């Protein structure tokens, strides 16, 4: 039993020691097909040659310098992320939660006396203080109340509620294009378009949390692209640096004008090792976009017998009428790693390199898991 390292999640009864492609291997040498990919982080699978070469090559040269100095990879990475997102500036951080914190600071500086955030019921934006304030899940949020930040929560895809929530004191609308921890619930195209329209009309900022949906997961680089809208601020993290800690906040020049130097900083963020790996990941991710869309449809078809499939690309879920944990356990015992969120929703976040044969392999294991 682990007596010193405090778990921050309900641990599965397995310890992994290595990985290759879409498979993990445990201490006993047993292999598992992984459709969780480190909660969406290991998007290129395990031991990917480009990622390994970048890590080992850069580790021999320079790992860390701190925010006091530049490095040869930070500006090219910032430029590429800005080009991809349609935005102008990038601020590097260590995680999705820290990206939320920095985004909230950007909103505060831009909006001045207007402080209210409109966010979504069921949303998740990290476990830091600011992230909890805008997370629309009472079980996670309430234990740390009260919060100084005023937040109005609205039901996803309820356009009437969204319209009613806007007032002169609203500074921003914060959304996930697909609510990840909230059950993999996609926002409707018209809803995201209305959010953009309302923010523009009221002078508020549109803030897209793309930590789970972004960087290829849905079959497009960003989830907001499905609606053809342009956010003012975008947060990214999870797969950005191939398993190394790195996130970023992307924002417009208009927002940048209101953000003083040193308003947010991080000792480790944007270092040469993580930034070099991120450049390799983004190049490979763009090449894989057609494959993500194609194999995502194959995965959805394989999941269809078990319930109405939700999501896009390789971010999929099946809501059940029974608890999901027993299915997760049965699948794991049979060599397949999946995830359950919101107690009854099976979630699938496989590596982008998942093959059609592996989709069929997963389907066969799931069939056995459901028959137990």
Segments and roles (model prediction):
Residues 1-372:
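Conserved N-terminal phosphate-binding loop of PLP-dependent enzymes in the Aspartate aminotransferase
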């Amino acid at each position: 039993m682990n007596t010193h390292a405090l778990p921050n999640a309900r641990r599965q009864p397995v310890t992994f020691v290595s990985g290759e492609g879409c498979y993990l291997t445990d201490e006993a040498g047993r292999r598992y097909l992984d459709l969780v990919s480190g909660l969406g982080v290991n998007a290129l699978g395990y031991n990917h040659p480009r990622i390994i070469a970048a890590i080992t090559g850069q580790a021999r040269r320079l790992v860390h310098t701190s925010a006091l100095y530049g490095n040869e990879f930070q500006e090219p990475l910032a430029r590429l992320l800005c080009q991809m997102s349609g935005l102008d500036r990038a601020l590097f951080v260590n995680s999705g939660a820290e990206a939320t914190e920095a985004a909230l600071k950007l909103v505060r500086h831009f909006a001045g006396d207007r402080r209210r955030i409109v966010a979504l019921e069921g949303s998740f934006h990290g476990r830091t203080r600011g992230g909890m304030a805008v997370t629309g899940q009472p079980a996670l949020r309430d234990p740390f109340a009260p919060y100084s930040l005023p937040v109005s929560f609205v039901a996803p895809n309820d356009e009437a509620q969204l319209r009613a929530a806007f007032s002169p004191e609203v500074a921003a609308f914060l959304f996930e294009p697909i609510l990840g921890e909230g059950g993999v619930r996609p926002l409707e195209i018209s809803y995201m378009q209305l959010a953009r329209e309302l923010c523009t009309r009221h002078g508020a900022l549109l803030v897209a949390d793309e930590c789970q949906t972004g960087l290829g997961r849905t079959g497009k680089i960003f989830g907001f692209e499905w609606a053809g809208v342009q956010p003012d601020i975008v947060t990214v993290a999870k797969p950005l640096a191939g398993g190394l800690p790195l996130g970023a906040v992307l924002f417009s020049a208009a927002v940048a004008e209101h953000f003083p130097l040193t308003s947010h900083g991080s000792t480790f963020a944007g270092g040469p090792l993580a930034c070099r790996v991120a450049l390799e990941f983004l190049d490979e991710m763009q090449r894989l976009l057609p494959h993500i869309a194609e194999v995502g449809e194959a995965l959805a078809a394989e999941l269809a017998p078990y319930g109405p499939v939700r999501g896009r690309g390789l971010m999929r879920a099946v809501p059940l009428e029974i608890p999901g944990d027993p299915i997760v356990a049965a699948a794991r015992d049979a060599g397949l790693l999946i995830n359950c969120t919101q107690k009854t929703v099976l979630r699938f976040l496989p590596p982008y390199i998942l093959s059609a044969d592996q989709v069929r392999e997963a389907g066969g294991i799931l069939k056995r898991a459901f028959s137990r």
